[in-house]
């Protein structure tokens, strides 16, 4: 009986002294996403499927239109992700961001971009160029460049896909790569006529 009493007291003490769980960071972002990969059109990965070309090689631009991480404003922040899907990624943050924004993006990567963060080989600041219009998208970083054109459908309007099963792929507009290139010590590729898209990404914490 005494042993049970002492055990109960011990458990109670542990419960009382256990440190509180850290609160989830407060964050939210709305971003324009532009990507080209090596899959044929339209990339099945965006529907929750498997790539139709392995390895899937891609470049994704994330341009944050509005958002924050805790008290840091992220509006205007952009970064480029070069990736070999599920294997590795190299992330280039626009060199115009502040030191505080850089820290915020680095903290946000494992939360909002966990897939890219898991295989991250490098996270560096670098010059990034981007030119996004309704008919043409061009963006580049130190080792990668993408040039893609919109695909027209019925009535000459852009081909769009609604309600894809991922918050990063809303307002999805279909593009086709004109030139999609990467050259580094890790890999080299050059694709044309492959999948491309622009979309809106909106994500945030629950608090």
Task: Identify the meaning behind each predicted range.
Residues 1-5:
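Positively charged n-region of N-terminal signal peptides that target proteins for export
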Residues 7-15:
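Bacterial N-terminal signal peptides
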Residues 18-24:
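Sec/Tat signal peptide C-region and signal peptidase I cleavage site
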Residues 24-207:
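Beta-strand-enriched cores of mature, soluble protein domains
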């Amino acid at each position: 009986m005494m042993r049970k009493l002492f055990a109960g007291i011990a458990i109670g003490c542990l419960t009382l002294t256990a440190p509180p769980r850290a609160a989830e960071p407060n964050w939210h972002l709305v971003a324009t996403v532009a990507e080209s990969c090596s899959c044929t059109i339209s990339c099945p990965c965006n529907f929750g499927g498997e790539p139709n070309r392995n390895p899937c090689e891609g470049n994704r631009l994330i341009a944050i239109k509005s958002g924050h991480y805790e008290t840091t404003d992220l509006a205007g922040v952009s970064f480029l992700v070069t990736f070999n899907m599920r294997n590795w990624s190299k992330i280039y943050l626009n060199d115009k961001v502040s030191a505080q924004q850089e820290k915020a993006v680095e903290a946000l990567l494992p939360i909002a971009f966990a897939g890219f963060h898991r295989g991250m080989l490098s996270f560096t600041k670098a010059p990034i160029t981007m030119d996004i219009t309704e008919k043409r998208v061009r963006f580049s970083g130190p080792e990668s460049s993408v040039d893609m054109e919109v695909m027209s459908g019925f009535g000459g309007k852009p081909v769009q896909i609604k309600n894809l099963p991922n918050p990063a792929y809303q307002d999805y507009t279909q593009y086709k790569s004109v030139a999609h290139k990467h050259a580094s010590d890790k890999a080299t590729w050059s694709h044309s006529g492959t999948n491309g898209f622009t979309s809106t990404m909106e994500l945030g914490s629950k608090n």
